[in-house]
Amino acid sequence: MKLLPIDRWLLPKGRSRRSLFDMAHVRAALEDLFGEDLHLARVRSMANGVVGILGASLVSVAAIGRAYARIAEIESKSGVKQVDRLLSNDGVLLDEVMPLWIRHVLGKIENILVAMDWTDFDDDDHTTLCVYLVTTHGRATPLAWRTVKKSTLKNRRTKYELDMVKRVAAWLPEEVHVTLLADRGFGYAELYRMLEGNRWDFVLRFRENIFVTKQDGTKAKASVLVPPNGRAIRVTDVKVTGKLDPVPAVVLVKRKNMKEAWCLATSLKTADANDIVRAYSRRFSIEETFRDTKDITFGLGLRATHIRDASRRDRLLFLIAIAHSLLTLLGVASEASGLDRTLKTNTSPKRTMSLFNQGAYWYSCLPNMRDDWFIRLMTAYEQIVREHIYLGEILKFEPPMPSEK
């Protein structure tokens, strides 16, 4: 299997540093990454779309096309038509591009934490099932997704979810070990069994009214077993629901800042309960990435864009995933160079602007950025890319490992 390292995003020698992520740079990088596996014309079209997203104020077809046209110095209507044709191109198969994208993000990383969740686009009767890499910076990195009609979800949801796990398992390099996080809607026996069959670990929340049966045969609702003092407890070798589905362990906790208790089914039966809770708390990073993608005020505004066809949405989400990752990478350079301090309007030592939004800001500044700041930013960017082989190495969160106790 060909590996797709991150050094493709270094500028070629002789190119001006101010041309970072311009059309020539993005085209060359994507051709190098995907050109052997995909038709070259399609790769170039995808690169044009990514450049359009980087330069657009909104991820609508018209806005992306006009931004691309402005950069490519072509007629605006031509840019819009090119983007529209790309999104409708049945030759751009997500089953082909997603495995390549996953290889680019993960490379040879052996241990990953991923979150799975649905996100809705109600105005278009769409809902998208996503599997994202959980990271250290509060935003999950897109790995795989599939959009379906929300009105057809009834009685098919479980099938879609199991199929997604099956696909991702097939696309991942064999040596990658996965720990899956998911909310209450995913806490069912069929998923437990599939994850165990794939040798994936999991931390899946389930409802408080589900019965938990201990080894000694005592049975109670999960809500009854939650400690009142805010401590997390782990109960091993239990059975859940009235059907007595076996689960290696459950972790139960309700802390002061929690609206509801967390009842977590997990395969990590020897891991510390607090580590399980800490890992599950990272699940919310997928929702923050949804906001980056959908919110018209704080993100790319996909919620305001009407897309009737589910396949068009999935192709657009692929372009967004690339653009989002590049801007996040630039945001990492922002903090490494210390330039993030110039963006803060307070004295808080904590991050007040996401890496994605930092990257988006500095990307817009590149053409006219003052020289001393520009040199600091680009030096940090190049050092980060050279010191790491794969994108996921820079951002990933280490899953909880079973304790030795």
Regions found by a protein language model. Name each.
Residues 47, 61-62, 80, 84:
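Short amphipathic alpha-helical segments
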Residues 54, 70, 89:
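Nucleic-acid substrate recognition interfaces
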